[in-house]
Structure formats: structure tokens, C-alpha cells
């Protein structure tokens, strides 16, 4: 008989960022365990709050199915000797299958007799198997863990209670002295402990005790309350998804409430107010319909509406203190000149082996000047880049950024404009940090893009120069994120810069300054490989097929925009019959070209038939076509230049024996193929493209 099963893990409050990954991990482990045990089940529900992780499995079978198996052993001529007695091979097979030799059967397979063993394994009761879930619970991993009392188990937070209920029956096991039972607990202040009679009643029973166990239901309730307040007050409440997720996992019973702050604080930059409310207090800022920030906020309490006015006043008091501090920092910062702030960077260590922040700024200045030239920026933009680079990091020494590190760049822009810098310079200072995370916007201005590239490139290359290379999950300087940011900037801006040239130039510059602790040539190869792997990661995330990505990355690393353009073109063509034929022809050329001897050049005097001359002419047309196409970054035209020589290639192979007996003729034909192959492989390695049968 199928019955529902509930597993609930009660904990001290988990950090909000732990909740979703933890319940996802637990749900995946439980489902994998059920599948491994061969147990049939219905729908699986996940429930998670700061104080509990729970899995409800509907219609869980009461036992495993019986297993009937038949295994083939050795051939009969090996299983029995001349006297008909069982050999060691047969005895060993029978023992391995857990049967007697008298139970072995003989069957013919393709005309040969073999011995077979039939085994019957009775399925175990589910109630006997379920205690194994203890190992799944103790096997959960967390970003940080702790130990408590004298127990050896490391966990996110101390375990407070355990529920394991199969139908009406408790599944017995214990963890760190906590025994499983049917008793769970409601809201810490509004609810009470209570027994569960049946797993199915879990979510509804908790609601009666002021706990909304379903995270999506809590999130929807919060959004609904925010929308209601918007309508009541004619406000606009921008919903930051990260903040919404965090608040959802901070409460078990959400109730939204509003508060206000003094109008005078609106004189502070909008970003300062939003950061103070959102990042430090987990409040939702409130705006007017025209986008102006209003002196109100919305917060979400973990409880009901009782004494809500007092709660609002308490939150207002906390925010007032925070904003007063911010106002003090803001006014104090403006007493320091940009030059004085910049000079303090010489006293801040970026890394003991790479130098100070002042030295980093100098490197950024040199790199950005070179990048601006390579990107063909105009004279005005170059001046903007030069000035922005010179003062790029001055805001790091301000009180405001010291208190709110997430405002670096933003405060640089604000203070730079107040100090008389041009809006273009100020914006570039802000944009140097973009993109800050996956999916974030890239710089809008050319100057900002160049400064962002220089900053990120210096961080990556300088770390590599002293052996700080990401390994596995270890990436303390976020070099993967920095490299990914570089790739997205190059892709969106279409700058004619290659990752390889950028990395090599930056490394050579660092080497000249004496910061290298690693071998230069080895580090260059590590950097090129690192950027290629990051590019592959970004392309796969963009949805390109792995084989097309591998094909494109096998070609020289040209500018990122062109790499993506080639991948898009190949993706569009991938299912065309003609594309398959083109790929086969091009691959045939590149495959045979591997046999070409080095140092041999094509000689028309050694041609013996017209197809050789035609292939040479086609090769010259391909070279010209590719050159013209890449001048305007036209991946389609470049592909067409290759595709148009398909018929000529096929005719050549139909009428010409490449591996001729005469060595000179053979080498000349291989050299001809090698010349064409170089053009083909400059686009992609077509041999890596996979076609479905």
C-alpha cells in the first residue's frame, strides 16, 4: 500500500543564503536515493524556511519490487569437464550468483550452449530502508559549517528536531542525540509544538501555527503585500529579485509594513539611500511614479500585524541612525581633494607581491592607454580614458566606500563630478566596475569600457604573474568573474581586441616592472588557456552546442565578437543538408593536409591535371574572400568564401590521387591542400562538428 512520507529537519535559524541551496540539495539527494532503491513514488514537494528543511513524498511504495534476474555464465564446454562434472569456472559462477550448481540451467545462444543462473531477490520493506536517509541529512554541505556541544558532526546550524513520518508511523533514527518523531514546531513566537498525524497535513498544519512552509508561497505573499501598498499610497516599489529572495528566506510568516525617514536625507545621492536601505537593512525603497526616491520604505517582519506600529517605529529609528552616519561620511569625504585621496592609494596594499593600489592605478593607466589605441578610440575619448584612469580608484579611501564597499565607483562618479571633472570622466570611473556579476550591464561608453578592461585585465594578469591561479572551486580574487566580464565587454562593444594580445601585452608590462615570480612564457600559455576556457564557458552559457564551440575555439583566438559571430553562423547552418556536405569536403582537406611535409611550397610546374589548377585558383579566391569578409567582421561572407569551393574540392578528389607514387607530385598536392587547410582552419575546425545520424 502506498503512503506519503515526510522528512523534516528542524534547525536554529539558517542564514538566508543557505536556505534555497540546502533544500535543493536535500530534494535531489532524496529523489536520487528513491530511484537508486527502486521505490516508486508520486510527486515530491520541497518546503524550506530559516528554521526547517522538509521533503514530502506522495504515494511512496511500501516495499521495493521483487527482482527476477537471469545471468549468463561460461560456455558449457568450459563449465563441465569431460566426465560431466562442474568445473571451477562453473562453481565460481554459481557462488557469485548465490545459487547451487543444481540450480544452473543450460541454454543455447547463437548455437553455443551456456550455463545460466536465475536469481530472485525479494524487495525490502520501505520502512526498513528509510532510516538510511540519516546519511543524506548528515551529508549535506554548506558554505560554512559549525560544531556544537561534543558532537563531531559539522553542520550549518545545530539540529533541534527531526520528523520522519511514513503514513502514520515514525521512522526511527537519531542524529547527534536528536530522535526522530512526529512532533514539529510552529513559529518561534506565535506558534507552538504539535504532533503530526499524517504527512499530507504538514503544510496546512504549519499555517495554523503561523508558518508558511512553501518558499514560493511566502514570496508570492510578500509581492502581493508590496503591490497592495503601492496601490494604497500611489507608490512605486521596485522589486529587487535578490532582496526578495533574501527576505523570503529570512521569515516564516511575512507581514509587510511601511516606515518613513526625514526628507533632509533625500539630499544624499540616491544610490547611498538605496544601498543603506536595501543592503544593510533589507528594506524595499519607495519611489514616485516619475522615479524620484520618496522618504519611505517597506520592510517585512517575521510575524503578524500585532504591535506593527511599534515595529515600524523601531525600524525608523535604526534607519535614521544609518542615514545620519551616511550623511556624515558624505560631507566629510568632500573635504578631501581628489589629489589628496589619490595619494593615499600608495599606502594601501593591493597584494604584497604585486604592489600598492597606487601602483595598480599606474598599471591601469598604461594598459588603458594601450587599449584605447588598439581599439581606435578618438582623441577626445582617449583624453577621457587617460584622466579617468589617473583617478580611477581615489574613492577607495573615502569614508563612504569604507562603510559601503558596494558603492565603489558610484561614489567615485559622484565625488568626481562635484570636484569639477567632466561627466564623461566621472561616468568612466563608475563603469570600470561593470559588469559586477553575471547578467549585469556592461559599460555604455567607450572610455568606461576601456577602463573596465584595463582594471580587470590587470587584476587577472598580475595575479597569474605571482602564481595566484584559480583551481577547482578556489578563486579568492574572483579571476574567473573578471575574465568573464572582459569577454562580455568585448562582445557587446565589438572592440577589435583579442584576448591573447591583451593578456600577453599586460604580462610583458608587469614583467618589465619586476613583479613576476613565475616564468614568463609558462605564464603566457596559462593565461591564454585560462581566457580560452572562460570564452568556452561563456559561449556554452549562451546556448551554443559544445561541438560548435570546440570547432570555433580550435581556430586562432580572434576578437570575441567575431568568435561569437562564427558560432552563430555555424549554429544556424548546422541542420542544413548542404552544410553537412560542405563540412565533409572541408574536413577532408584538413584531414589530409596533416600529412603535408614542412617547408614545401606549391609549384604549378608540378601540376598534372586541370583540377589542381582549379583548386589553387579556388584557394586564392578563398584567401581573398576571407580577408575582405573579416575587414567588416562578416562571418557569413567568410563562410560563403569557404563553402563556394566545395564543388572544386570534390572534383579535385574525384580526379586526383593525392598520395601519388612520385614523391614530388605527392608533396606538391599535400602542400596545396595544406594551404587551403590554413584558410579553413582560420575559421573553425570543421572536423569537430557532430551530425546526427
Swiss-Prot record:
Its main location: cytoplasm. Tetramer of two alpha and two beta subunits. The gene is glyS. The keyword Nucleotide-binding applies. This is Glycine--tRNA ligase beta subunit. Its EC number is 6.1.1.14. It is found in: Cytoplasm. GO terms for molecular function: arginine-tRNA ligase activity; ATP binding; glycine-tRNA ligase activity. Keywords: Aminoacyl-tRNA synthetase, ATP-binding, Cytoplasm, Ligase, Nucleotide-binding, Protein biosynthesis. One of its GO terms (cellular component) is cytosol. InterPro entries: DALR_anticod-bd (IPR008909), Gly-tRNA-synth_bsu (IPR015944), Gly-tRNA-synth_heterodimer (IPR006194). It comes from Shouchella clausii (strain KSM-K16). One of its GO terms (biological process) is glycyl-tRNA aminoacylation. The keyword tRNA processing does not apply. Pfam families: DALR_1, tRNA_synt_2f. It catalyses: tRNA(Gly) + glycine + ATP = glycyl-tRNA(Gly) + AMP + diphosphate. Disulfide bonds: none annotated. It comes from the Bacteria. Belongs to the class-II aminoacyl-tRNA synthetase family.
Amino acid at each position: 500500500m502506498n503512503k506519503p512520507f515526510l522528512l523534516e529537519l528542524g534547525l536554529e535559524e539558517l542564514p538566508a543564503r543557505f536556505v534555497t541551496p540546502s533544500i535543493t540539495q536535500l530534494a535531489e539527494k532524496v529523489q536520487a536515493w528513491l530511484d537508486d532503491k527502486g521505490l516508486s513514488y508520486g510527486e515530491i514537494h520541497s518546503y524550506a524556511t530559516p528554521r526547517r528543511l522538509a521533503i514530502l513524498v506522495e504515494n511512496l511504495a511500501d516495499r521495493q519490487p521483487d527482482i527476477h534476474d537471469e545471468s549468463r555464465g561460461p560456455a558449457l564446454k568450459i563449465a563441465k569437464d569431460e566426465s560431466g562434472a562442474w568445473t571451477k569456472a562453473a562453481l565460481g559462477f554459481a557462488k557469485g550468483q548465490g545459487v547451487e550448481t543444481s540450480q544452473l540451467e543450460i541454454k543455447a545462444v547463437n548455437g553455443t550452449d551456456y550455463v545460466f543462473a536465475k536469481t530472485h531477490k525479494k524487495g525490502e520493506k520501505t520502512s526498513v530502508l528509510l532510516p538510511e536517509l540519516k546519511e543524506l541529512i548528515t551529508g549535506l554541505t554548506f558554505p560554512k559549517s559549525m560544531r556544537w556541544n561534543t558532537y563531531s558532526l559539522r553542520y550549518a546550524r545545530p539540529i533541534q528536531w527531526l520528523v520522519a513520518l511514513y503514513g502514520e508511523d515514525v521512522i526511527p533514527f537519531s542524529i547527534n542525540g536528536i530522535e526522530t518523531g512526529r512532533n514539529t514546531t510552529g513559529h518561534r513566537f506565535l506558534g507552538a509544538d504539535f504532533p503530526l498525524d499524517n504527512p499530507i497535513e504538514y503544510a496546512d498544519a504549519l499555517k495554523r501555527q503561523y508558518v508558511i512552509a512553501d518558499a514560493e508561497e511566502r514570496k508570492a505573499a510578500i509581492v502581493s503585500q508590496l503591490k497592495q501598498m503601492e496601490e494604497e499610497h500611489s507608490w512605486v516599489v521596485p522589486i529587487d529579485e535578490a532582496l526578495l529572495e533574501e527576505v523570503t528566506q529570512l521569515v516564516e510568516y511575512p507581514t509587510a509594513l511601511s516606515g518613513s525617514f526625514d526628507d533632509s536625507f533625500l539630499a544624499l545621492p540616491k544610490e547611498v539611500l538605496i544601498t543603506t536601505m536595501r543592503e544593510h537593512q533589507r528594506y524595499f525603497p519607495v519611489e514616485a511614479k516619475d522615479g524620484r526616491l520618496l522618504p519611505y520604505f517597506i520592510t517585512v517582519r517575521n510575524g503578524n500585524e500585532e504591535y506593527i506600529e511599534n515595529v515600524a517605529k523601531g525600524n525608523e529609528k535604526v534607519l535614521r541612525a544609518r542615514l545620519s552616519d551616511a550623511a556624515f561620511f558624505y560631507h566629510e569625504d568632500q573635504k578631501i581633494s581628489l589629489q589628496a585621496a589619490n595619494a593615499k592609494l600608495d599606502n594601501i596594499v593591493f597584494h604584497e607581491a604585486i604592489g600598492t593600489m597606487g601602483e595598480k592605478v599606474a598599471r591601469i593607466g598604461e594598459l588603458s592607454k594601450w587599449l584605447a589605441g588598439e581599439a581606435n578610440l578618438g582623441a577626445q575619448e582617449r583624453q577621457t580614458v587617460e584622466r579617468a584612469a589617473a583617478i580611477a580608484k581615489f574613492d577607495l579611501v573615502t569614508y563612504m566606500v569604507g562603510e559601503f564597499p558596494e558603492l565603489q565607483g558610484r561614489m567615485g562618479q559622484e565625488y568626481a563630478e562635484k570636484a569639477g571633472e567632466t561627466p564623461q570622466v566621472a561616468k568612466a570611473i563608475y563603469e570600470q566596475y561593470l559588469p559586477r556579476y553575471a547578467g549585469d550591464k556592461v559599460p555604455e561608453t567607450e572610455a568606461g569600457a576601456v577602463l573596465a578592461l584595463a582594471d580587470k585585465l590587470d587584476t587577472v594578469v598580475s595575479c597569474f604573474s605571482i602564481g595566484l591561479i584559480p583551481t577547482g572551486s578556489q578563486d579568492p580574487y574572483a579571476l574567473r568573474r573578471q575574465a568573464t566580464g572582459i569577454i562580455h565587454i568585448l562582445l557587446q562593444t565589438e572592440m577589435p581586441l583579442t584576448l591573447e594580445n591583451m593578456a600577453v601585452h599586460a604580462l610583458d608590462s608587469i614583467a618589465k616592472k619586476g613583479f613576476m615570480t613565475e616564468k614568463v612564457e609558462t605564464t603566457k600559455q596559462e593565461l591564454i588557456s585560462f581566457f580560452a576556457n572562460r570564452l568556452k564557458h561563456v559561449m556554452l552559457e549562451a546556448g551554443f552546442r559544445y561541438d560548435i564551440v570546440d570547432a570555433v575555439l580550435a581556430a586562432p583566438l580572434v576578437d570575441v565578437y567575431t568568435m561569437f559571430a562564427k558560432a552563430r553562423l555555424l549554429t544556424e547552418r548546422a541542420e542544413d543538408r548542404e552544410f553537412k556536405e560542405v563540412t565533409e569536403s572541408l574536413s577532408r582537406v584538413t584531414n589530409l593536409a596533416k600529412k603535408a611535409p614542412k617547408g614545401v611550397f606549391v609549384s604549378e610546374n608540378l601540376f598534372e591535371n586541370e583540377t589542381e589548377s582549379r583548386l589553387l585558383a579556388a584557394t586564392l579566391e578563398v584567401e581573398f574572400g576571407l580577408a575582405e569578409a573579416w575587414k567588416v567582421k562578416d562571418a557569413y561572407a567568410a563562410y560563403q568564401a569557404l563553402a563556394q569551393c566545395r564543388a572544386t574540392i570534390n572534383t579535385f578528389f574525384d580526379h586526383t590521387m593525392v598520395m601519388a607514387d612520385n614523391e614530388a607530385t605527392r608533396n606538391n598536392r599535400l602542400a596545396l591542400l595544406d594551404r587551403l587547410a590554413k584558410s579553413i582552419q582560420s575559421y573553425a575546425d570543421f572536423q569537430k562538428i557532430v551530425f546526427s545520424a
